[in-house]
């Protein structure tokens, strides 16, 4: 049992002094015990707030875990009690406050590698103690590491800690501080003790560099970098420091170095000679004596829902806990946003604000988090130009060539991966827009060339970026990533955002499930599913609302309906499966020749039950075991012409028996409206231009869009995979999402068709011969594509 006899069991037995910190559910005060005259920190948790949000059991969970612990590197919980209004936790007082605040305000510069090794040794010793008892902390950060009077590091704040039943047990909860959260936690994959190892890597990087490895101006971009494990290793670090950081920040948790190996790493030899040796030894029989039984009721495994404080004059760690995916959780997430607003939960902090878990879909909080208090230094720190950009080097590996025009710039990704930005200004003397500035960035983001073509005049806008100028001066126009002047950072950020957008639309893994075709994009966050029934599941960046569309392309507003629940359940399963596939292939790719790549990759195939035997090409060998067909249509051929439609409606007999001028004109028009151009566009489908100006695109998923010129009435016709054809008279914003997605490919299609050669006369004749002269509804013709 806890040695509580020396500490008071009521608040009256303490002399409460000044406030140390305040949050949404609790306040922390410095106090002195009237019995022992010892200074302590008392956290007062408002019972009304935790009962109102169903977080009572989570408070007990934190108390249960923390009260069992006693180790030199763990902040001690002396005792706890309650009255009618509050739950009181009597904690060890850390006189020198948070490590984060000490580094930024007292030192105003990073730690030396020797001091960082000393701090790391104490933190690792404390984590080894926790892990030996199957306790996962899940929120190791500089704000949760406190400094005692003798400058010993103490692990604090067990609000997110969880008790594992066995060392290999996995959890699915997304929680923690964004700058220190692991990729598997962000991706909502199963995670275990290795998540704390990742946080140790972020901690070491922050100690020796002065800022977290994945720090950005916004929570969302930070999480994106964490998922991609993109960080910059400064050149001034020693080889030992770089090696240990890289081993700690392995994206695959199974590849990370163990905590025992950290203590034996050569970097730890930099530790100061007078540093205290590790006091952890799990092999000693008495080691478990410190792991004492908790008072009170045992509770189910789950997160604490409170904000904890335990440092001198510290600000709150301000984290919003996610709900465990367990039936034992009984919190009411709908009430949390109201409490956050009423009690000032989102307070500015010099450290990255925690990521609000999926309890609210309001993106306003994201904007607040991304706009304040995310600098790695305090306001008193001097921000020099030598500091690096808050965006990692871009990377265009596997991205296809593309070109996109905005009002003021034209952005391109070339075939060899180079990114080109052409900035456009209107020249009144020439009465046209001209390219006045050009920024070229290598595919790995390391080399940047900036120049002005034909100064004063600029270049005319062309279909392709202009070639690099041969007369560019060396150090005035050519930079590397680390030496890029701050005046050009916006250009680089502009390019990085463009590459990020392209990644969010470029499939990395295509997976055919039993119900849908799934695309996991290159950024490892965006995920889309096109159900074979016509429905759609769209998952984008963390914090943005999941979007579901029914078979008719209408957005589902009620995500609690049975249809939406089934789609969400299947979507989450497929997303996790694609992430696991990606991790496995990346592991195989790392062990193989670096010149070989596994991506993009297609896994599985569309179920054969969706394709009837009669829909297959006779005499053709289906190399992918799958044939897609467009649904039944009243159009006798792939050509969308009014004469063909009329011919279909009247039947073949009416055509053969009528010799009127109108019929002859219809037949003549039908024969004239033949394909004149046809190309196969990778990742899009087969595009055809007809002699009457109609442009048809047969997509690889079996759907089709026909763009009708104004002379023939205008508009477009969209045919779904399930056979439903819809005519839209205008290209307005009311189009269904499926149509808008496909229309986004049309500029590329038209550009490719413009450059495509005309079909030969032999090819035209073959096509005319293959086109049915007439078709009745009882004998439909199917347009088929074999992939």
Swiss-Prot record:
Residues 675-755 form the POLO box domain. It is an enzyme of class 2 (transferase). Keywords: ATP-binding, Cytoplasm, Cytoskeleton, Kinase, Nucleotide-binding, Serine/threonine-protein kinase, Transferase, Ubl conjugation. It catalyses: L-seryl-[protein] + ATP = O-phospho-L-seryl-[protein] + ADP + H(+); L-threonyl-[protein] + ATP = O-phospho-L-threonyl-[protein] + ADP + H(+). One of its GO terms (molecular function) is protein serine kinase activity. Residues 506-613 form the Cryptic POLO box 2 (CPB2) domain. Gene3D superfamilies: 2.40.50.930, 3.30.1120.120, 3.30.1120.130, Transferase(Phosphotransferase) domain 1 (1.10.510.10). Residues 14-268 form the Protein kinase domain. It is found in: Cytoplasm, Cytoskeleton, Microtubule organizing center, Centrosome, Centriole. One of its GO terms (biological process) is positive regulation of protein catabolic process. GO terms for cellular component: centriole; cytoplasm; nucleus. Its EC number is 2.7.11.21. CDD domains: POLO_box_Plk4_1 (cd13114), POLO_box_Plk4_2 (cd13115). Residues 386-505 form the Cryptic POLO box 1 (CPB1) domain. Ubiquitinated by the SCF(Slimb) ubiquitin ligase complex; leading to its degradation by the proteasome during interphase and regulating centriole number and ensuring the block to centriole reduplication. It comes from the Eukaryota. Residues 311-336 are annotated as: Disordered. InterPro entries: Kinase-like_dom_sf, Plk4-like_POLO_box_2_sf, POLO_box_dom, POLO_box_Plk4_1, POLO_box_Plk4_2, Prot_kinase_dom, Protein_kinase_ATP_BS, Ser_Thr-PK_POLO_box_1_sf. Homodimer. Belongs to the protein kinase superfamily. Ser/Thr protein kinase family. CDC5/Polo subfamily. Serine/threonine-protein kinase that plays a central role in centriole duplication. Able to trigger procentriole formation on the surface of the mother centriole cylinder, using mother centriole as a platform, leading to the recruitment of centriole biogenesis proteins such as sas-6. When overexpressed, it is able to induce centrosome amplification through the simultaneous generation of multiple procentrioles adjoining each parental centriole during S phase. This is Serine/threonine-protein kinase PLK4. It comes from Drosophila willistoni.
């Amino acid at each position: 049992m806890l040695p509580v006899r020396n500490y008071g069991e009521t608040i009256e037995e303490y002399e409460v002094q000044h406030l140390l910190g305040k949050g949404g559910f609790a306040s922390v005060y410095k106090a002195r015990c009237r019995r022992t005259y010892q200074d302590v920190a008392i956290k007062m948790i408002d019972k009304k707030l935790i009962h109102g949000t169903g977080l009572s059991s989570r408070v007990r969970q934190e108390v249960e875990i923390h009260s069992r612990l006693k180790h030199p590197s763990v902040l001690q919980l002396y005792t706890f009690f309650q009255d009618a209004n509050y739950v009181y936790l009597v904690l060890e007082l850390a006189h020198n406050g948070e490590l984060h605040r000490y580094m930024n305000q007292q030192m105003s510069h990073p730690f030396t590698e020797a001091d960082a090794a000393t701090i790391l040794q104490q933190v690792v010793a404390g984590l080894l103690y926790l892990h030996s008892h199957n306790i996962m902390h899940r929120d190791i950060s500089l704000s949760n590491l406190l400094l005692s009077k003798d400058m010993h590091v103490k692990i604090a704040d067990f609000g997110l800690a969880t008790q594992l039943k066995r060392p290999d047990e996995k959890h699915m909860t997304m929680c923690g501080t964004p700058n220190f959260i692991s990729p598997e936690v962000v991706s909502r994959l199963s995670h275990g003790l290795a998540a704390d190892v990742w946080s140790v890597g972020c901690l070491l990087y922050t100690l020796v560099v002065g800022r977290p490895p994945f720090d950005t101006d916004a929570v969302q971009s930070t999480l994106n970098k964490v998922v991609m494990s993109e960080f910059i290793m400064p050149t001034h670090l020693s080889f030992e420091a770089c090696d240990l950081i890289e081993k700690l920040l392995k994206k695959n948790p199974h590849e990370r170095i163990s905590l025992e190996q950290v203590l034996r790493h050569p970097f730890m030899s930099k530790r100061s000679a007078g540093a205290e040796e590790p006091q952890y030894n799990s092999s000693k029989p008495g080691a478990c004596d410190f792991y004492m039984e908790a008072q009170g009721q045992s509770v189910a495994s789950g997160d604490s829902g409170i904000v904890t404080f335990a440092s001198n004059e510290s600000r709150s760690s301000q984290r919003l806990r996610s709900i465990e995916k367990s039936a034992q959780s009984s919190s009411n997430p709908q009430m949390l946003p109201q409490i956050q607003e009423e009690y000032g939960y989102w307070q500015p902090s010099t450290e990255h604000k925690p990521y609000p878990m999926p309890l609210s879909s309001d993106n306003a909080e994201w904007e607040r988090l991304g706009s304040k208090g995310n600098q790695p230094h305090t306001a008193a720190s001097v921000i020099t130009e030598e500091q690096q950009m808050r965006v990692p080097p871009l990377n265009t590996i596997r991205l296809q060539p593309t070109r996109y025009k905005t009002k003021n710039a034209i952005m391109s990704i070339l075939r060899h991966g180079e990114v080109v930005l052409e900035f456009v200004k209107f020249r009144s003397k020439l009465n046209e827009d001209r390219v006045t500035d050009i920024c070229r960035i290598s595919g790995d983001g390391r080399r940047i060339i900036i120049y002005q073509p034909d100064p004063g005049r600029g270049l005319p806008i062309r279909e392709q970026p202009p070639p690099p100028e041969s007369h560019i001066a060396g150090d005035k126009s050519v930079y590397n990533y680390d030496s890029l002047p701050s005046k050009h950072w916006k250009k680089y950020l502009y390019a990085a955002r463009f590459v990020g957008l392209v990644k969010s639309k470029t499939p990395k893994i295509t997976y055919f499930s039993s119900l849908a075709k799934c695309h996991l994009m290159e950024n490892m966050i965006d995920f889309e599913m096109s159900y074979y029934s016509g429905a759609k599941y769209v998952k984008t960046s963390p914090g943005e609302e999941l979007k579901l569309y029914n078979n008719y392309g209408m957005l589902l507003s009620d995500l609690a309906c049975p249809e939406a629940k089934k789609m969400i359940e299947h979507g989450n399963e497929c997303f996790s499966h694609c992430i696991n596939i990606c991790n496995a292939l990346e592991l195989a790719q790392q062990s193989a020749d670096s010149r070989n790549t596994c991506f993009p990759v297609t896994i599985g195939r569309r179920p054969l039950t969706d394709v009837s035997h009669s829909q297959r090409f006779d005499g053709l060998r289906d190399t992918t075991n799958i044939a897609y067909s467009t649904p039944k249509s009243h159009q006798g051929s792939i050509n969308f012409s009014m004469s063909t439609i009329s011919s279909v409606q009247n039947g073949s007999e009416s055509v053969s028996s009528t010799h009127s001028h109108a019929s002859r004109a219809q037949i003549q028009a039908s024969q004239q409206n033949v394909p004149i151009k046809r190309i196969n566009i990778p990742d899009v489908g087969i595009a055809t231009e007809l002699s009457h100006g109609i442009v048809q695109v047969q997509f690889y998923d079996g759907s089709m869009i026909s763009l009708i010129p104004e002379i023939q009435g205008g508009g477009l016709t969209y045919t779904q995979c399930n056979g439903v054809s819809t005519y839209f008279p205008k290209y307005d914003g009311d189009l269904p999402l499926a149509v808008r997605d496909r229309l986004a490919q049309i500029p590329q299609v038209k550009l490719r068709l413009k450059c495509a050669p005309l079909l030969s006369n032999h090819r035209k004749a073959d096509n005319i011969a293959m086109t049915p002269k007439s078709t009745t509804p009882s004998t439909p013709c199917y347009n088929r594509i074999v992939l």
